[in-house]
């Protein structure tokens, strides 16, 4: 923020109607501040021109005021405020009075600073994202397959009996985990039962027959 115009002006007091010299600063944001002197240590008053000022009078337009001794009426300047207060001023010269008039008038009617401040605030509100709590984070869905609840058909096995006849009977499988193991068909062949005593008798009989045959052969020779 910078100064738009600064300088000395005579200001008439509100009660005693005396003229007093003050230092005036007009800032770029539209604030007109006047001090006791140029050091700016003691502020007399301030006026926000875009908000407080409703009219600016110069020269013969000024009311209820007489210029200080030695000053023409064209050096007079009045700032009419919204609250009914009127600040009566007198410039060093007519040209200085016109320069102050035009500068103050531009500051009063120029709402670029106020408008930009309001616009930036609205833009910031519009551009700001909503609270994160407004949008809940979606819960991720997990898809899986449960264990197989069905049962595989029972396998079969073929069993041959001693007489050579085949039989198909279901085969029972042990537990094979969650998914189980597919059954398979198996063939089991059982050899026919042989009697050990019968085999021994047949062997002895065969041996005796062989011995008799050999004995007869030797007897002939």
From Swiss-Prot:
It is found in: Recycling endosome membrane. One of its GO terms (molecular function) is phosphatidylinositol-3,4,5-trisphosphate binding. Disulfide bonds: none annotated. Highly expressed in brain, retina, heart and kidney. Detected at lower levels in lung, muscle and nerve. CDD domains: PH_evt. A 1,2-diacyl-sn-glycero-3-phospho-L-serine binds at residue 20. Residues 2-109 form the PH domain. GO terms for cellular component: recycling endosome membrane. Involved in retrograde transport of recycling endosomes. This is Pleckstrin homology domain-containing family B member 2. It comes from Mus musculus (Mouse). The lineage of its organism: Eukaryota, Metazoa, Chordata, Craniata, Vertebrata.
């Amino acid at each position: 923020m910078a100064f738009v115009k600064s300088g000395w002006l005579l200001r008439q007091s509100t009660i005693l109607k005396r003229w007093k010299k003050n230092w005036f600063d007009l800032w770029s944001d539209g604030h007109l501040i006047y001090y006791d002197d140029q050091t700016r240590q003691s502020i007399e008053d301030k006026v926000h021109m875009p908000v407080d000022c409703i009219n600016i009078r110069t020269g013969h337009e000024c009311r209820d005021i007489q210029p200080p001794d030695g000053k023409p009426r064209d050096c007079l300047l009045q700032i009419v405020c919204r609250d009914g207060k009127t600040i009566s001023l007198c410039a060093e010269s007519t040209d200085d009075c016109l320069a102050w008039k035009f500068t103050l008038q531009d500051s009063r009617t120029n709402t670029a600073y106020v408008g930009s401040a309001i616009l930036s605030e609205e833009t910031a509100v519009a551009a700001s994202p909503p609270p994160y709590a407004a949008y809940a984070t979606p819960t991720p869905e997990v898809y899986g397959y449960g264990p197989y609840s069905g049962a595989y058909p029972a396998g079969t096995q073929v069993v041959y009996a001693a007489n050579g006849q085949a039989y198909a009977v279901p085969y029972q499988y042990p537990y094979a985990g969650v998914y189980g193991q597919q059954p398979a068909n198996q063939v089991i062949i059982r050899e026919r039962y042989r009697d050990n005593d019968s085999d021994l008798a047949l062997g002895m009989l065969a041996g005796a027959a062989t011995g008799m045959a050999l004995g007869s052969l030797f007897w002939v020779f």
